[in-house]
Amino acid sequence: MSAFIVLGAQWGDEGKGKMTDYLAENADVVVRFQGGNNAGHTVVVGEKEYKLHLIPSGILYNDKLNVIGNGVVLDPKALFEEINYLESLGVEITPDRLIISDRAHVIMPYHRILDGIKERARGNKDIGTTGKGIGPSYTDKMERSGIRVCDLIHKEVFEENLKETLEVKNKIITEIFGGEALDYNEIYNEYLGYAEKLRPFVKDISVIVNKKIKDGKEVLFEGAQGTLLDIDYGTYPYVTSSSTIAGGVCIGAGVGPTAITNAVGIAKAYTTRVGKGPFPTELLDSTGDWVREKGHEFGVTTGRARRCGWLDLVILKTSARISGLTSFAVTKIDTLAGLDTLKVCTGYRLNGEIIDYVPASLEDLAKCEPIYEEFEGWDDSIANARCYEDLPENAIKYLKKIEDFTETKVSIVSVGPKRDQTMMISEI
């Protein structure tokens, strides 16, 4: 195994940060390839808890190279706030440990402003954006009007690009939405300061990452969000603005598909999502409330309560197919301890037909009735399991169902938030 992917197999919040931290122990390089500081990863090391948004989870190891790829949209203000936060917890961050793609696009103040304005303008049709400027930054990237990191650190290029872009953005903000114009000098001076601080970290990451792979180093690609939030294969428009699936690695980190050897899908033992959109297995009762409280299902980035539901194997099967997953890592199976009976969705009934895939149409997905199979539960002793044989028999049956239905093995099981509560039960 030389280069492998860790990505979310549901609607995000599956425990990718913890799994990346666990797998990073044997990696040499950890690469973020998409998204921005809208992501939220929580990693527990000993008695310390770290909340990461932009910087790869490998930063918690002293001997790893961490990479922010060109597919990421970078908010310099958020980056340096996160660096200061980590350094306050004793994590050293230097250009030897963190590098940033010169091709990554930069989130500007007008992106955050427009994100909020447009979301409010949607009224009850809002899509649940985090308001961090992610979508507008990706929009500028596709419209070829964005500012990249390599532009930002070249003063003359940045000056010219900012003048041209801000003139257009201010017209949109003031004339269309009735907002206040942004001040050029204020933005220019603020971002010049960021440019100087960024400069030592900026590299052509594609060259470096490919050389690491060629030299036989272990490279881990860390995804953000989840498969059902992918811009193409997610529950559009209630999605993020980037490609969250395995194919996004090639574009977002500048590596070829033949370089990737394995892809691990991270899946909770139940299902959650934040914000609006269809959710076939959602629990709108006391069981859903119980799972939310026991699983601490509140967003790291937004603090919003997550919607909770039964495990949806249709979603996992779809994720395995789209990303060519070689295995699953199942997290938070301990959260379900104490329930006498569990349900697992094994298909949807749509217009009288049974299907085992996620339909593209939101209207169709909203009409899907979940078909359930019931399983007997297990008790809280599962949190003490440290190997596969320690797991309760009913939990093993539950995991076996995931494998059989998705035709994808379960390689890792997590029974709690700490590093030592993770067990590898087969090769990934």
Curated annotation (Swiss-Prot):
Catalysed reaction equations from the record: IMP + L-aspartate + GTP = N(6)-(1,2-dicarboxyethyl)-AMP + GDP + phosphate + 2 H(+)
Principal EC category: ligase
Keyword Calcium part of the UniProt annotation: no
Disulfide bonds: none
GO biological process: 'de novo' AMP biosynthetic process; IMP metabolic process
Subcellular location: Cytoplasm
GO molecular function, one term: GTP binding
InterPro entries xrefs: Adenylosuccin_syn_GTP-bd, Adenylosuccin_syn_Lys_AS, Adenylosuccinate_synth_dom1, Adenylosuccinate_synth_dom2, Adenylosuccinate_synth_dom3, Adenylosuccinate_synthetase, P-loop_NTPase
Binding sites annotated in the UniProt record for Mg(2+): 13, 40
Cofactor(s) demanded: Mg(2+)
Residues annotated to bind IMP: 13-16, 38-41, 130, 144, 225, 240, 304
Primary site of residence: cytoplasm
Positions contributing to substrate binding: 300-306
Pathway the protein acts in: Purine metabolism; AMP biosynthesis via de novo pathway; AMP from IMP: step 1/2
PANTHER family linked to this entry: ADENYLOSUCCINATE SYNTHETASE (PTHR11846:SF0)
Similarity comment: Belongs to the adenylosuccinate synthetase family.
Role this protein plays: Plays an important role in the de novo pathway of purine nucleotide biosynthesis. Catalyzes the first committed step in the biosynthesis of AMP from IMP.
Name of the molecule in the record: Adenylosuccinate synthetase
The species this protein was found in: Clostridium botulinum (strain Kyoto / Type A2)
Gene, per the UniProt record: purA
